[in-house]
Amino acid sequence: MFRGKVRKIHFIGIGGSGMNGIAELLLNQGYTITGSDLKESPTIERLRNLGAKIFIGHSEENVKDADVVVYSSAVKPDNPEMIKAKQLGIPTIPRGEMLAELMRFKYGIAIAGSHGKTTTTSMVGTVLGKTGFDPTVVIGGKLEAYGSNAKLGRGEFLVTESDESDGSFLKLTPTIVSINNIDLEHIGFYKDLEDIKKAFVAFANKVPFYGAAAVNIDDENVKSILPYIERKVIKFGFSEDADIRAYDVRLENGRYKFKVNDFGEIHLSVPGIHNVYNALATIAICNELSVPFCVIKESLENFKNAKRRFEIKYSNDIIVIDDYAHHPTELKATLSAARDYFKDRRIIAVFQPHRYSRLNALFEEFAKAFDIPDITIVTEVYSAGESPIENVSGEKLAEKIREYGNNVYYVSNLEEAENLLKNIIQKGDVILTLGAGSITQLSDTLAKYLSEKE
């Protein structure tokens, strides 16, 4: 960016998972950063400690001196800061456009797909960090190795997850992309699945002629768009058609071990068959960059996932795991990973649906996602600013789950969920808190409660 023109950058919703990493990178590059959010959080405290000025609550006064205003997809047009910025003639841009600006001066590696973006981005960043690449990395979750959502590197590469939710990933200019999967999601923005597929085709074709698109050949929706991709394609998966192929895949001690081409064998550090695919995407990208397989293997076998990705919050006689899963496909993957890892233990899933629109569009799929837990607890919907939809609620979902023969409870809020758990948990239980809303607070509360009981 032209520093003579842009010095002060304001972020509306600066505490959001997609926003704070970009803000941190810009802080580290010497820009003056201000921001606003609805509540305090450890993320906001970290940004303040790095030099950002952050306001709690949205006000016209917050933007008056900004050179540009960056907003997240959660910010509505009637936000007072958005309105004031436009009145003052201050440019307002979505976070994806600011990310694209950061990528413009780098070789971009953009990780896309309906699921697994944060983990795959973290894996690629971890592998490249073990080489001389020293990449800049921006992810949607806090990675333990960085202590934050972002790392400013000195190398020529920028690795980021790309957000398809509002189409802003089409603003990026990546050299290499990965498409891990395509699923029906973000119904408020896309008309249907075909509309989503078209966006991913456009995304893949954004890479230059010397770039590449790594794609999951085992995902039927991804496979269906291959004829329309006009760039080099690297296919990964279990299929014999894959360029980067996993075979002899087996479960050992709750984690997957597999062989890749004639490169060698990997024993993943993170559970779940979905993470085999995330690892294959990573291998495809890093192999394209001529990273030695021994470096890839060591990095993946010692990889520690981002926050809220099968994050163990408490481990003793009872296990508490927190996960961001909020789509039926993600829920099934996380619950399957838990069953693989904790074979004979009772699993209790506590799920907080996220957005009425998502629950409405995928109601049956959500209801069928809970056949693995021994007990399921469903809370009321976390609205994320949406208005309620008639006959769409956590209580209705619990009723539908019960129709499929599963043991389910409905609670209206997290406090009720906590009280219920305290009454039913027993030695040996594995508790998973699942969702993209405030459900993570319950995992912290439970971890504290169980620690104090020791």
Curated annotation (Swiss-Prot):
Enzyme Commission number, as recorded: 6.3.2.8
Location of this chain's protein in the cell: Cytoplasm
Pathway: Cell wall biogenesis; peptidoglycan biosynthesis
Gene Ontology biological process terms, A to Z: cell division; cell wall organization; peptidoglycan biosynthetic process; regulation of cell shape
Annotated GO MF terms: ATP binding; UDP-N-acetylmuramate-L-alanine ligase activity
Keywords assigned: ATP-binding, Cell cycle, Cell division, Cell shape, Cell wall biogenesis/degradation, Cytoplasm, Ligase, Nucleotide-binding, Peptidoglycan synthesis
Ligand binding (ATP): 113-119
One GO term describing the cellular component: cytoplasm
Top-level EC class as recorded in UniProt: ligase
Reactions performed catalytically: UDP-N-acetyl-alpha-D-muramate + L-alanine + ATP = UDP-N-acetyl-alpha-D-muramoyl-L-alanine + ADP + phosphate + H(+)
Family statement drawn from the similarity comment of this UniProt entry: Belongs to the MurCDEF family.
Database matches in PANTHER family: UDP-N-ACETYLMURAMATE--L-ALANINE LIGASE (PTHR43445:SF3), UDP-N-ACETYLMURAMATE--L-ALANINE LIGASE-RELATED (PTHR43445)
Entries under NCBIfam families matching the protein: murC (TIGR01082)
Task of the protein: Cell wall formation.
Name of the protein this chain belongs to: UDP-N-acetylmuramate--L-alanine ligase
Organism for this UniProt entry: Sulfurihydrogenibium sp. (strain YO3AOP1)
